[in-house]
A protein has these predicted regions:
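A structural boundary/capping signal
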Residues: 12-505
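Sec-dependent signal peptide recognition
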Residues: 1-7
Length: 505
């Protein structure tokens, strides 16, 4: 990756031949590298060449001649330091820098959105679903209630505008949408080097790697954090991207042949790669819902810490952006239950009962178990209990779930989690017995029947394998969905025991 202060560290009076050689190696379409060169050598011949190139890349001639746009080497150094950050210190640009970038960015397409002027959370909540400026919205969520919030919003927004200018510098005026996507991928993931954080870090600090200011400060982000940055820049380029959210994930899409996987440097992955045994189809989100997903991610941190009041508060705020979302309602009701606020739990779960989740095949046991009186706050806490990566943590969870099941044998969610935990521990016999017991209470769950078919095959139990195989085939036909995992399992069974195979021969 381009090193931030390579040029700044060079001698102030280098040999002209060396300068000529150095400049010839700069990417002519990289606005940042041209700016670095000019910022360090403004009075040299090559520095003036860089200045001329900067004016060309910024398309200064297309701007209003009355707008004050003056190239300033010191100002450029500050802007570049803000984009190529080497510390997590918050970005705070002065007014001249902000005004300078704003004057250069008046043609950014996000300026036509009503949401580009929002300054409070109320503005966002009441704003039009598809007229939200995602960059401004995320900055309002982060800073809107702080005394100096407006200054911070404008400062970070200037950095977003500057980043969009850097992407535009690589594009012709007739650039296609596909070319814009490729230019954004190059700038974000290669020139700036944005990366997915280490697994151990992102699990503990998912809020840090989700909120847009933190993503800009760290140049790292989880799928949602980098997708928010990507979408904010796309709006400035006039790109209308679709937003999809498989459970626990998010990706963007220009069209079905060009999806954007922000955890893998923007590569395309087919829609089928995001579907699974549990997920029949994908939720398509609005710009407003995208902001709500950030609050949703924040709440998971407090849920993990068992701060159920704070988690519930954030889930409530997320619902203002994503009304009637089944996953948020389930987690909100669960937080209320674990906090022993039964009246609020009843209100939320009553609402959830009326909502049909079309995209998921997995049955929701928690709501039904609550109304049947099978569930307890302590039992639910065991289900949501976080586990470490070590084996002992899983073993301890299995012991806790065993105790919960013994105390509440009809609590299906606990029994399901116990079976899955046994699977993770490779205790296949125990997993089979636990899930088969659950099957007597819930025989219409495709995921459950898939696991029982797989475990029967692992145990080489032909009668049970064929029994559950037929049930699985019935359920996937009923739901009109045949995921790849099921296809592979059925092929494996057919290969081992072909149809019409007589074991007595």
């Amino acid at each position: 990756m381009f090193k931030i202060f390579t040029l700044l560290a060079l001698s102030q009076s280098p040999d002209p031949l060396y300068l000529e050689s150095l400049y010839s190696r700069q990417d002519p379409l990289s606005l940042t590298k041209q700016l670095y060169f000019y910022a360090q050598y403004p009075d040299t011949h090559e520095g003036q060449r860089a200045k001329k190139k900067i004016l060309e890349l910024l398309d200064i001639s297309s701007l209003d001649p009355l707008m004050p746009v003056e190239l300033n080497s010191i100002l450029f150094e500050e802007l570049l330091k803000a984009v190529f950050k080497t510390t997590t210190k918050p970005i705070l640009l002065d007014s001249p820098s902000i005004n300078f970038i704003n004057n250069l960015s008046l043609n950014h397409k996000n300026r036509t959105l009503k949401g580009s002027s929002h300054l409070t959370r109320g503005d966002l909540e009441n704003g039009d679903t598809c007229d939200i400026d995602v960059g401004r919205g995320m900055l309002v969520l982060a800073f809107g209630e702080e005394p100096d919030g407006k200054e911070k919003i404008l400062s970070y927004e200037a950095v977003l505008d500057f980043m969009a200018l850097c992407v535009k510098a690589r594009l012709s005026k007739e650039a296609s949408n596909e070319e814009k996507v490729h230019a954004m991928n190059h700038f974000i993931f290669y020139e700036l080097g944005y990366r997915f954080p280490a697994h151990s870090e992102h699990e503990e600090k998912i809020d840090t790697y989700t909120l847009l200011p933190s993503v800009l400060d760290n140049r790292q982000g989880v799928c949602l954090g980098v997708s928010l940055l990507y979408y904010a820049l796309a709006q400035r380029l006039g790109l209308n991207l679709d937003i999809y959210t498989p459970p626990g994930h998010i990706f963007l899409s220009l069209h079905e042949d060009l999806n954007i996987e922000t955890t893998a440097r923007g590569i395309h992955m087919p829609i089928e790669a995001y579907l699974s045994l549990h997920v029949k189809s994908l939720n398509k989100r609005t710009q407003k819902e995208l902001l709500g997903m950030a609050l949703f991610n924040q709440s998971s941190v407090f849920l993990k810490k068992q701060d159920f009041k704070k988690a519930a508060d954030l889930y409530e705020k997320a619902l203002a952006f994503i009304p009637d979302d089944p996953q948020i309602l389930e987690l909100l009701g669960s937080c209320y239950l674990m906090d022993k606020q039964l009246a609020k739990t009843h209100r939320v779960f009553t609402k959830l009962q009326k909502i049909k989740e079309k995209n998921l095949l997995t049955s929701n046991y928690i709501v039904e178990d609550f109304f049947k009186g099978y569930i307890t706050p302590e039992g639910l806490q065991a289900i949501f209990k976080d586990v470490d990566s070590d084996m002992q943590s899983l073993i301890n969870k299995s012991y806790e779930l065993e105790a919960i099941h013994k105390k509440s044998p009809k609590f299906r969610s606990a029994l399901y989690q116990l079976g899955i935990t046994y699977l993770q521990l490779h205790q296949y016999e125990k997993a089979f017995l636990a899930l088969e017991k659950l099957y007597t209470q819930a025989d219409d769950d495709p995921a459950l029947v898939y696991y029982l078919t797989q475990l029967s095959l692992i145990r080489f139990d032909r009668p049970k394998t064929l029994l559950y195989k037929e049930k699985l085939k019935f359920l996937i036909k009923k739901h009109d969905y045949n995921p790849q995992a099921v296809q592979r399992l059925l092929e494996e069974i057919e290969h081992l025991w072909p149809s019409g195979f007589d074991t007595n021969l």
